[in-house]
Amino acid sequence: MSKLTKFIYASDSHGDMADPEALAALYEFTKDFGGSSVIKIAGGDQYDFRSLRKGVGTDKEGAESLQADLDEGKQFFDRWRPNVWLWGNHEHRLDAAQGAGSALVRDYCQGVKDHINAHARKCGAKTILPYHADKGVYRLGPVAMVHGYAHGANATVLQGLHYAPYGGALIHGHTHNLASIALTKHGGGNAFSAGCLCRKEDMTYSAQRLASARWGSGFVAGFITAGGDYKAWLVHKMGDQWIWTKDVKTFTPRSR
C-alpha cells in the first residue's frame, strides 16, 4: 500500500458544553486510526464564550464566568493535541468584543486570546488560522477545510462549490449537522459537514431553532495518497454507539 497521509477534522466541542462521550469516541478513534502520525485539525468553536455572544451583556448569560469554559477548552487541546486550529465564530467573539466596550474589556479579551493561542501552540498546533472567509482556509492536498461561513439547509453545498478545488473536497463545521454531498461542479468534488462534539440539550439557543433537529455527534476522517487522491468519510454516533472501521486499504487493478 502506498504511503497515506491520514487526517481527522473535528470541531464544535464548545468548551464546557462538550459532550464527554463524543470526545471519548474521538480520542479512541484517533488511537485506532494512527495516533500521533495523524494530522489533526481542530475545526473551531473549541471554546464557547457564550457570555460574549452579545458583546458584554447584562443578562444572566452575559454574567457567566469564562473560567470553566476556558478550562474545558484547554483540556481538549491537552488531550487531542491538534496540529492545526481553525478559529470559529465563538473564538472570534474575543476579537469582536475588542471592537466595542471599555479598555478593560479589550485588554481582557486580548489577554484571553493570547493565552488560548499560546496553549494551543504548546499542545502542538503549528498552524492557527483566524475566523476569516479568505484567511481561515486550511488546505491539505485536494482537501480544503474551514470552520464555516454559511448557514441553512444548503450550507454544505454552497461552501463546497466555493472552496473545494477541482476534483477535491471541502470539510466544514459550524452548522453541527452531519452531511456528505457529491458536488455538481466541473471536475466533481465532495463536501462534508462534520457534525459536532457538544451537548445539544444544554445549549439553550438550540430549542428555538428548527435546524437543531439535524445536529449530530461526529467528525470527519480521511487520507490523501502519495499521488494526490483523497478519501474522506463521516465517523458518527449511531443510536447509543459509535461505529468505525480500523483498517484502510487501497487497491490498484492489475490491468493498470
Which residues are covered by each model-predicted region?
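Beta-strand-turn-beta hairpins that frame and shape the catalytic cleft
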Residues: 1-8, 137-144, 227
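Active-site-proximal loop/helix segment associated with metal-binding centers of metalloenzymes
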Residues: 102-144, 148, 175, 193-201
